Structures are given as structure tokens and as C-alpha cells.
Amino acid sequence: MINLVVTKRTDKNLLSLMKKHYRQPKGFVGRYICSAIYYNFDYYGHIIGGSCTLNLPNRNQFFNINKNNYKNIINNIFYHIEKVNGKYPIRNFTTKVLKAWRDKISIDWKKKYGDKVIGFESLIEPPRTADLYKKDKWSYIGRTKGYTCKRVSGREKGVFPYGKRVWNYKNLRPKLVFVKHVEIKATKD
């Protein structure tokens, strides 16, 4: 059985995966919830939901939202899963984990931040093909320009009081944009 367990960002398993991940993130900015992925008692990886991206092509039109609704969109900012003993425990495991995560983080996000989740977004860097998102019926809505941003020490004017953002407009890394509405579960009357 898939079991997602909320962890801190400093979880030793997560820190180890961050070093192996293709992006090698140093941390996460904004709001986020980290979840360890278990099947029965075996650890398979981590999945993290965080604040949505500020500027994302076609996202606002897809969800029919504006900036006031950004707190209701969760970005799948990190997903790293590895086989145990050379295999996954069940068929389509990565997609089933993604679905379980969507269901669980919608509840966890509301409890932690007080915001009802209306949808999800994820940015996939080629050559990755987003197959697991396609199997989970996410919609492809476009491609980013590929700008990257990192935080360094210092101060910045505006809404970001901690650290200074440094943008890279030259070494572009465009990403595929996938989104999905929250699925409304039918209730019995």
C-alpha cells in the first residue's frame, strides 16, 4: 500500500535524493510540504508540493484565475523516486504515487495553510517526457522561456525579504508545463 508521510525539508533521505536529482536543488522557497514515499515499509523517494510559479504560460487561462488565486495552486516542485531491489512494487507505481499525492496534499495544504486547492502544476525539463503526468491525465499547456533564478545572500526590494534573486536569461532551460484540476469526488446523498 502506498503511504505518504510528511517530513521536514531536512529529512536525511530527502537531502540525499536532492544531491542525485537532475536539478540538484539546494532547498525550496515559499510554502511547501515534503512527503516521503513508502510502499508497505520500503522507502522509495520523496515528492514535494510548493507555491505555484509566479509567471507561467497559459496557467491562468486554464484555471480561469488571477494572482489572487495563486495560493490555491500547488506546484509539484520535486519528485524523485527510485526502485528498491531493482523494481517498483506495483505496475504504474510512479503514476499511482502522483495520484495519491494529489489527494493527500490537497488535505494537508488546507490544514497547514488554510487554502483550498483548486489545481496543480508541474514543470518538466526535457529530455524528460512527462509520461507519468500524461498517464495521470494532466494537460500540457505550453513551454516556459527557460529563465532560471537562484537566491543569494543580500537584500532585495519588494515582497522577497530574505535573500536576493539572481536571474539567468542566457543559459535557458525551457520546461514543459503540465496542469491538472482537483478532481471532485462524488458524494452519496
Regions found by a protein language model. Give the residues of each.
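Short amphipathic alpha-helix that is part of the acyltransferase structural core
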Residues: 1-31, 36, 43
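Residues that cap or initiate secondary-structure elements
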Residues: 10, 82, 128, 184-186
